[in-house]
Amino acid sequence: MLPAHKHTLETLLTDVVKQVAQATQGESEAAFIAPAITLERPKVAAHGDVACNVAMQLAKPMRANPRQLAQQIVDALLADPLAKGLVDGAEVAGPGFINLRLSAASKQAVIAAVFAQREAFGRSQREAGKRVLVEFVSANPTGPLHVGHGRQAALGDAMSNVLASQGFDVHREFYYNDAGVQIGNLAISTQARARGLKPGDPGWPEAAYNGEYIADIARDYLNGETVSASDGEPVKGAGDVEDLEAIRRFAVAYLRHEQDMDLQAFGVKFDQYYLESSLYKEGRVEKTVNELIAAGKTYEQEGALWLRTTDDGDDKDRVMRKSDGTYTYFVPDVAYHETKWERGFTKVINIQGSDHHGTIARVRAGLQGLGIGIPKGYPDYVLHKMVTVMRDGQEVKISKRAGSYVTVRDLIEWSGGAVPGQEAAPDLLDEETIRRGRDAVRFFLISRKADTEFVFDVDLALKQNDENPVYYVQYAHARICSVINEWKSRYGADETGLPVVDLSPLDSERATALLQKLAEFPDMLTHAAGELAPHAVAFYLRDLAGEFHSFYNAERVLVDDEAQRNARIALLAATRQVLANGLAVIGVSAPAKM
């Protein structure tokens, strides 16, 4: 049911309930407060198109038999002139459910709505004027992005698109942890490679990174190459093996550039890259710590500075500043989130791995301790579980590129069908291979709830049949494009007249099911935004593709009867648009040919 029709029906039922209350209880309509009307689609098609339980909600307070009350509501609704054209019939079922049958015209109205709104169909402005910051990926610049980062990128970008579909002003942000111990390990790893050492050699640092990418960084540093991240200044390799700081700067810039390339291949863009190091350079960390001290939220013990996190629900107080003067890792996180609040983002969503669960209470407690009006649940967190990669029936745990894990780029190349010799050499890959791999990876990685573990089956991603969910959905779009092109060619037709086509021939069971699924798209997006659940879009697209394939397999489209043919083409054109709109939300292409 379209949102406009749903709102109309909810209003009608609310008014009718008030009328029934007045007639049976003698209570004035103005004084009677009707419960919120909830409309749901019955699980069994034979039970109608919409179900409502308002009679059972009111039975006790009105001291009425729920079935009798439901019948009174049904009679009053069907007698209301405003219900004509929207409701075809209604009946009472079970203990007092009201099952409604919508008119054929109201079901078919979704096609006109799709044609009128096109790419905007499904979108809403209900959250217009509200700003939200979505932080995701936020990888250390110490290596290529791994598949966990890929899941974050797919979730974060899709979630941002879902929120934007409801009118939110969405700000995508990547937080670079470029000031920790890992950066020091990156520098000594690159230095060791520059000295000609490799993993396993005497003198190879114990904490070093072993991936082949370290050798690439060292080579370019020695050759005096220049690298830069998308938002950074160019850094030239100094070539001095002894200058560890120069090596560090070059290695960080090199890997930030590599991560930029990974994200570009994945089709993900950010509005801002925020560097942890800037928090120290600008004195933000010290400022936040001093504010917490001034607020009386800290104490000193055994030479360390502690934060009273138990005041805000943590299981124990936490060390902020160690006895050697260095800060624990969650302190800059508190400072960083204070900047989010100060920048005007009253709604913030962090997408992180489930291994970050322990930091949530600490960060929130630190923000509460500042006493600047930040809500207790700030920020929101969406934690995702790990991704296991399967290829050729075996779990893949390492790659040559990274040394100890599978990278996002590995996954894109494998899922795109890269042949041996192309892997780890993106310049050898054609755009179609990258697109196919990107589509598969993005669709797969949001096709499960974030808090469930996910097995990424590369072999499944390569299949071109109904077993592969992204192929199944994209093929529905391509199949429709093919049919419409054939219609244009065979009958000399064009799509300009489709918005005014007579839709009354769309009265079959399969056509009706497809129409109803199309009408669910706007509410699905609203639900996905409210629940921070982008996987709902993937679920919906699979269901929509299924309804289309069922319709197409049951009913021939290019029939001799012109009215029936044009009505079915209009249905297909609307389905094509909604498939494209949904795929765009999750960052997946809608190919016209496959």
UniProtKB/Swiss-Prot annotation:
GO terms for molecular function: arginine-tRNA ligase activity; ATP binding. It is an enzyme of class 6 (ligase). One of its GO terms (cellular component) is cytoplasm. The keyword Isomerase does not apply. InterPro entries: aa-tRNA-synth_I_CS, Arg-tRNA-ligase, Arg-tRNA-synth_N, Arg-tRNA-synth_N_sf, ArgRS_core, DALR_anticod-bd, Rossmann-like_a/b/a_fold, tRNAsynth_Ia_anticodon-bd. The lineage of its organism: Bacteria, Pseudomonadati, Pseudomonadota, Betaproteobacteria, Burkholderiales. Its EC number is 6.1.1.19. GO terms for biological process: arginyl-tRNA aminoacylation. Its main location: cytoplasm. It catalyses: tRNA(Arg) + L-arginine + ATP = L-arginyl-tRNA(Arg) + AMP + diphosphate. It holds the Pfam family tRNA-synt_1d. It comes from Paraburkholderia phymatum (strain DSM 17167 / CIP 108236 / LMG 21445 / STM815) (Burkholderia phymatum). Gene3D superfamilies: Arginyl tRNA synthetase N-terminal domain, HUPs, Isoleucyl-tRNA Synthetase, Domain 1. Belongs to the class-I aminoacyl-tRNA synthetase family. A motif ('HIGH' region) lies at residues 139-149. The keyword Membrane does not apply. Monomer. This is Arginine--tRNA ligase. Keywords: Aminoacyl-tRNA synthetase, ATP-binding, Cytoplasm, Ligase, Nucleotide-binding, Protein biosynthesis. It is found in: Cytoplasm.
